[in-house]
């Protein structure tokens, strides 16, 4: 929501300040998305983990921003869409890439997840993570709060198919799919055409349902106004491509306004079933940055030599 609010002239940062200062601004935008036919509506709590808010100077508003974010979204959804609690990165890297520990990361996200859960979200959307270790901490945090609600996770990648911390799309899928998550995907950074190439690499090795949420092209700022260079018609054009690669959940990230989503929904309504993409049959071992194929189990018999 932050980019959409910025494009509409609301320049306060973080965007979560509007949850308490001008809640109707957030509610109006969310109602527009609901009117376009979204199935899932995320809360305006992207930056609202306590560590990020403290860095931005809003540490004391942590609880208010999160509680208000859920209440506004639930009012906007009005049983027409399911409300998912939106959580994202702290802006720091977990040790050894950064200065805070894995346990600190888990506790940071647990505090946010607990409030979103108390306010009645119907699931969680973890998105725009570039450090897979921090994403794992967020997953653990959510599952400390609830073992039952659906959990969607998205990492963000550069055009070469790696995150800025060096994790490939394949390593991401192999590392995350055995955790207690329901949907694995990618979001942000890339336009649809670039996202497709990365998404296909993910889809080939991932055994979980898939999600894709690209940007509406490239941002353009003329000194007065922010816009993105991909029209809503061009954005919706990629619906078939996403489905062909097996996407079960399709949305948008930066620059995708209600009109982008309306046209995407119309395109999806004409073809609702994701394709069963051919999967890579190999098994893999993966670290944060290295993916290694392994051979299937091989049984070796040994002749018994009785004494």
Regions flagged by a language model, labelled:
Residues 1-307:
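Domain-level signal for soluble alpha/beta catalytic cores
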């Amino acid at each position: 929501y932050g980019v959409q609010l910025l494009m509409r002239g609301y320049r306060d940062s973080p965007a979560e300040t509007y949850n308490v200062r001008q809640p109707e601004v957030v509610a109006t935008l969310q109602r527009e998305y609901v009117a376009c036919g979204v199935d899932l509506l995320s809360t305006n709590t992207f930056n609202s983990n306590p560590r990020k808010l403290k860095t931005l100077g809003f540490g004391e508003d942590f609880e208010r921003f999160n509680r208000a974010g859920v209440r506004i979204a639930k009012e906007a959804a009005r049983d027409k869409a399911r409300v998912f609690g939106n959580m994202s990165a702290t802006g720091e890297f977990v040790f050894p890439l950064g200065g805070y520990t894995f346990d600190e990361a888990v506790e940071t996200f647990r505090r946010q997840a607990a409030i979103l859960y108390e306010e009645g979200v119907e699931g969680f959307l973890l998105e725009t993570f570039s450090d897979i270790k921090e994403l794992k901490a967020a997953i653990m945090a959510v599952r400390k709060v609830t073992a039952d609600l659906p959990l969607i996770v998205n990492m963000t990648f550069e055009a070469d198919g790696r995150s800025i911390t060096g994790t490939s799309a394949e390593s991401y899928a192999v590392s995350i799919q055995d955790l207690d998550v329901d949907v694995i995907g990618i979001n942000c950074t890339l336009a649809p055409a670039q996202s497709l190439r990365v998404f296909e690499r993910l889809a080939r090795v991932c055994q979980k349902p898939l999600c894709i949420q690209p940007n509406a092209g490239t941002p353009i700022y003329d000194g007065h106004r922010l816009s993105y260079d991909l029209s809503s018609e061009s954005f919706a054009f990629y619906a078939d491509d996403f489905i062909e690669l097996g996407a079960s959940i399709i949305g948008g990230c930066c620059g995708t306004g209600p009109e982008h989503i309306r046209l995407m929904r119309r395109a999806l309504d004409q073809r609702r079933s994701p394709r069963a993409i051919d999967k890579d049959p190999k098994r893999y071992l993966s670290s944060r940055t290295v993916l290694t194929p392994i051979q299937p189990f091989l049984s070796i018999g040994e002749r018994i030599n009785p004494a």
